[in-house]
């Protein structure tokens, strides 16, 4: 029947379980579909079909009925879960702070004329692994498809004032970032369920006060946030935005990003930081974005080149990757190189070797890392117990700060993994628009100064790397590679794995290892050519 087909089309995009705000019951898809047939509008549509099938009217009435609201809040102790609420009417739950929170959410949604509501506390049967997996991936889609998202600000009391939202605990949580970002319409409520700052407008996301506070909380402009879409793009920007947000469970640092990146991963609570490792490994494999490797600190249990905590991505433009050279600078430098005594044939060979490299990828927990390798010579400790110095042929004397006792390692290598930078293929951090420094307070000061100067632009030509804006011959392209190779870069410190000499592990450093190719002699060029390879990193 035409009406039932329209109903099935409508509920296909709905969450698996919804709260019927009238009855207070949890209903699955079959019950959601059946509920429409009990409405007077259903019988009116049936009667009207005796003479003419009005498809537009059917679609309008069905879609109007299946509008739903989503809930965004910070989880608390003793939340009403699916296994409890499935047996009882929401409005009959015994008195408690968390029960009252759910009941008020449902009442506000019901009073707004919406029949359906969804809360992550009771609308996900977390005991069903398939259902939990589906929900974590589909959540962004559900928030985007909602008529409104109700945000509950526990701890924000009436009368609320500007700044309360910025300081709220809701604004520190990992899950709430995607919930706010994905929702088209949002309304904020204080903890007594009055409107935040008495903003009696349909959509708080359009309020200048809210826009200003969210920019202050993230350090990023509203327009730039709107430009971000789910998918494996702008990876560094997204990781940066969530890097300071918190989760109760370690695994949720990764699982809360599945929808943002449109990635499906097996959900295994109890795996700890392996979850973040699996997420980052899949992102690196699908995108080839080496900015995922640009961090300093302790590595996780999944792979030594992936961190244990997402907070290491707090810098939008990581100093590990050299800054892009402007076209004017490049023209000046390469013109000088072209007239110098450099061995152009060796430079061309190096350029060819780099171009042949694949993008990095993972096979299980093993990373295939394209890079240029620099072997460290003798290592000695400086006056500081945690600072070591070593000699390398092409990089000169290198200083490394680490808790590790470097002399105990049999051999050590510094690697240059930023091949995309050398070939000008993938600039990092070229889209996010940063709020000017004077417009934000100290709470967003973790955004780097260099990042603040970036402005969003709708002109795709201006986002392209300089070398793609004009055609050059192969020799000029090779000279540009040499120019970039001489820029300071953050190297990764690797050592052969003790149990597998064909593989390597990253050695944790406390600070950035900044190095630079000092001179481009024929001997150095030959060493560089022979040092271009793909390493197995565990």
Placement of each model-derived feature along the sequence:
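Conserved hydrophobic ligand-interaction patch in extracellular adhesion modules
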Residues: 117-125
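A structural "flexibility-hinge" signal
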Residues: 1-64, 69, 73-112, 126-130, ...
């Amino acid at each position: 029947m035409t009406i039932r087909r329209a109903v099935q089309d409508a509920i296909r995009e709905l969450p698996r379980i919804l709260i019927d705000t009238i009855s207070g019951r949890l209903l699955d898809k079959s019950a959601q579909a059946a509920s429409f047939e009990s409405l007077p509008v259903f019988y009116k549509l049936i009667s009207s079909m005796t003479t003419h099938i009005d498809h537009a009217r059917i679609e309008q009435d069905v879609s109007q009925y299946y509008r739903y609201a989503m809930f965004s809040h910070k989880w608390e102790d003793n939340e009403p879960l699916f296994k409890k609420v499935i047996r009882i009417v929401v409005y009959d739950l015994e008195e408690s702070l968390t029960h009252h929170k759910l009941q008020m959410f449902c009442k506000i949604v019901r009073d707004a004329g919406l029949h359906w509501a969804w809360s992550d506390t009771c609308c996900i049967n977390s005991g069903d692994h398939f259902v939990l997996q589906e929900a974590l991936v589909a959540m962004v889609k559900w928030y985007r498809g909602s008529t409104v998202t109700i945000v509950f600000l526990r701890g924000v009391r009436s009368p609320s004032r500007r700044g309360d939202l910025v300081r709220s605990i809701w604004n520190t949580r990992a899950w709430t970032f995607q919930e706010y970002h994905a929702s088209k319409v949002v309304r904020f409520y204080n903890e007594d369920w009055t409107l935040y700052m008495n903003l009696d407008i349909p959509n708080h996301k359009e309020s200048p006060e809210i826009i200003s506070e969210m920019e202050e909380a993230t350090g990023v402009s509203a327009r730039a946030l709107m430009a971000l879409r789910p998918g494996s793009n702008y990876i560094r920007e997204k990781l940066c935005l969530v890097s300071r947000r918190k989760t109760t469970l370690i695994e949720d640092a990764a699982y809360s990003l599945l929808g943002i990146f449109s990635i499906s991963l097996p959900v295994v609570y109890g795996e700890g930081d392996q979850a973040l490792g699996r997420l980052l490994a899949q992102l690196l494999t699908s995108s080839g974005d080496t900015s995922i490797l640009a961090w300093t600190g302790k590595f996780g249990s999944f792979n030594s080149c992936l961190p244990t905590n997402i907070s290491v991505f707090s810098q939008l433009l990581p100093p590990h990757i050299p800054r892009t050279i402007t076209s004017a600078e490049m023209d000046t430098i390469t013109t000088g190189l072209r007239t110098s005594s450099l061995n152009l044939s060796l430079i061309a060979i190096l350029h060819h070797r780099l171009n042949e490299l694949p993008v990095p990828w993972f096979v299980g927990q093993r990373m295939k890392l394209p890079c240029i390798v620099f072997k460290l010579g003798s290592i000695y400790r400086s006056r500081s117990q945690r600072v070591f110095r070593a000699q390398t042929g092409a990089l000169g004397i290198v200083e490394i700060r680490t808790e590790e006792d470097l002399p105990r390692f049999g051999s050590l290598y510094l690697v240059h993994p930023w091949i995309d930078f050398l070939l000008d293929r993938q600039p990092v951090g070229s889209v996010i628009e940063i709020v000017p420094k004077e417009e934000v307070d100290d709470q967003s000061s973790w955004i780097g100064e260099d990042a603040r100067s970036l402005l969003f632009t709708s002109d795709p030509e201006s986002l392209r790397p300089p070398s793609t804006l004009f055609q050059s011959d192969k020799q000029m392209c090779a000279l540009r590679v040499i120019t970039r190779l001489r820029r300071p870069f953050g190297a990764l410190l690797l050592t052969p794995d003790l149990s597998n000499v064909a593989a390597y592990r990253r050695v944790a450093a406390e600070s950035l290892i900044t190095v630079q190719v000092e001179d481009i002699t024929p001997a150095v060029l030959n060493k560089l050519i022979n040092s271009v390879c793909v390493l197995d990193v565990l």
